Amino acid sequence: MSMKSAFRMRNFAKKLLLILFSAFLGLAICEIGLRLLGFKYSGSTWRNDPLLGWSLRPGASAWEVDEGVAWSKINSHGYRDRERAAPKPQGVYRVAVLGDSCTEARQVDRDKGFTSLVEEELNRRHCCGERQVEVLNFGIGGVGTGQELLLLRERVWKFNPDMIVLQFYAGNDVFNNHRALNTSSPDKAPYFLLRNGKLELDESFRQGRAFDPTYIKLKGVSADIMNSSALLQLVYKLSRLYAQRQEMARLSGAGQTVAPSDTDAPPPEYQRYLSYLPPAIPSMVEAWQVTEALIVELNKETSSHHAPLLIMTIPAIHQIQPNPKIQEAYRAKYKIESLEYADDRVERHARANGIPVLRLSKPLVEEARRTGTYMAGFANTPPNSGHLNERGHAVVARELVRAICEIAATRAAAKSLSKN
C-alpha cells in the first residue's frame, strides 16, 4: 500500500470514528434529556408462554403510564408480586389469587393492589390463626378461566396454597374462553372445548417459532433493552401512533358500519354489552357452557388439594357507574334488563356446586356514591373507565378480607366439631 493510500485510509477511519462518536454523543444527549424530562412509556413485561399463550416475564420491570402511573416489577417466578418461596415455609397460611389484569393490577403501585392490602390486613386481624398469612398474586392480564385452570394445575400448587380465590371479570372472561369471541388474541391462547359434556384442551396455538425457548429468550432481552431506554421508548411510541393513525384512516375510508348479527364472531364494539345479556348467538351459548364447566373443574381441582375455592366477581365499568342516570341510559340504549346478568349467572352456578361467591358491584357502587368519587379511572384516563384505581382496590380488599375471615372461621369451627 502506498503512503498516499495509507493516508487516505487513516483519514477515512478518523472521519468514521468522528461520525460514530457524534452519533453516540447525540443519542446519549437525547437519552439523558428525555430522562431529565421524566419521559416514560408503558413498557412490556410479557413473554410468549407454551402453557398459557402468554405470561409475565420473570425479572422484568417497566412503567405503566397509559392508565395511572406505576412501576411494575415481576418476581423470579413470573408474577407481579414480591418474591415467594416454593414450597411454602412452615408456619405460613397462603391464599392464591387467580385472575386477569384486575388482579395483576399494574395500574397501581404493588402495595396499593388488593392482594397486598388483603395480606396486610389478614396479618393484622389474625383470622387465619397465628400463622403468617401470604396472599400470592397470580394475576396475568388478558387470560380467561381456562388459562387460570391450567396455571393452577401446572404452576400454583408448588406454592402450597391453603385457599384459592378465582377473580372473575364479567367484562371479558366469558369471551376469553372462546376463540371466536376473543378478539384481542384469538390464535395465541389455549382453549377448552366441550365435547360430549367433557372438557377437551385445544393447544393448536403452539404452532410456529413463537414458542421456541431461544426465540422467547431473545424477545425478552430485546424487551428489557427497550424498557431501559427512554429514547427507544419514544421511537416505539411514535411508531405506534403512526400505525394507529394509518389504521384509523383505513377504517374511516372504508365507510362501513356494522351491526350485531347471528354469526359466531360479533363485531368487537358490540362485545362491550354482550356479557350483560342472555346469550343469543351460538358462540355466546358455547362460551357460557365452557365457562361454567371450567368453574366446576376448578372446584374439583381445589377440592382434591383440600383448598377451599372462593369466586370473587369484579364488576364491569357500567355496573359501578355512580350516576344512576348514566347507568340507566346505557341500559336503555342496548336494551339490557340487568347489568348484573353475568354476575347473577356465575353466582347461581357456583352456589349450585357448593362454591362461595363474593360479589363486588354493590360495595363498589355504594362507596362511589357515598364518597362522590370513582372506583375506576385515573388522572390520565376518563373517569370510571378502564381498571380499578387505588380507591377501588381498597374496597375490594376490605370485602375480600371479610370473606376470607368468614371461610376461615367456618372451617375452623368444622374442624373443631370433627375432633369432638
Q: Which stretches of residues belong to each language-model region?
A:
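Solvent-exposed, polar/charged alpha-helical surfaces in well-ordered, non-transmembrane soluble domains
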Residues: 116, 120, 150, 154, ...
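Generic structural signal for small/hydrophobic residues in well-ordered secondary structure
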Residues: 31, 100, 148, 164, ...
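N-terminal secretory targeting modules
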Residues: 1-94, 109, 158-162, 174-178, ...
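Membrane/wall-proximal cationic-aromatic binding patches
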Residues: 37-129, 255-270, 364-383, 420
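Serine-dependent acyl-ester chemistry module
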Residues: 112, 170-355, 360-370, 382, ...
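Histidine-centered active-site loop/cap adjacent to the catalytic His
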Residues: 18, 356, 380-420
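Conserved SGNH/GDSL esterase-like catalytic core that processes O-acyl groups on lipids
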Residues: 69-73, 85, 90, 94-96, ...
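Solvent-exposed, acidic/flexible segments
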Residues: 95, 107-111, 141, 145, ...
